[in-house]
Amino acid sequence: MFTFTLKQTMAVTCATIELINQYDEYKHQDGELDAAQIRRWSGELMIDTGAIRLAINEEIKNKLGLRKGTMTNITLADGSISQIEMVGGVKIRFGDRICYTGAFVLPQNTEPLMGCIPLEEMDLVVIPSENRLEYNPKHPDGALFSLK
């Protein structure tokens, strides 16, 4: 008789994403702010298809200069409910795809992540077998939205 143990591991997909203060961009467009003064952050975000929104940490919030947001209730992965800050005014860029969104603010320097809403808005897909994020191959020339 053979016995064996199957060990399952979950691969994590990360991608280099740029976050931009949306309000700084508006000020730049209105001639009130030089392009070099637009606050940005670029780095690795975990791509989490089980999460809904973008989640940044306090360090990223401060670097982007985002204003204090509102407290909102969230459900964590373990099923517990907690209150967390939600801020607005974040532009997300992956390659030539962009979206505008709010973000949950995680404590201190917790690992940031990007959830389903920004992925859908930018028409991006996760390739789990390769731990890669890429443009939807059905729409390589730009995001396609359905209004049905």
Segments (PLM) and residue ranges:
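Pepsin/retropepsin-fold aspartyl endopeptidases
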Residues: 1-148
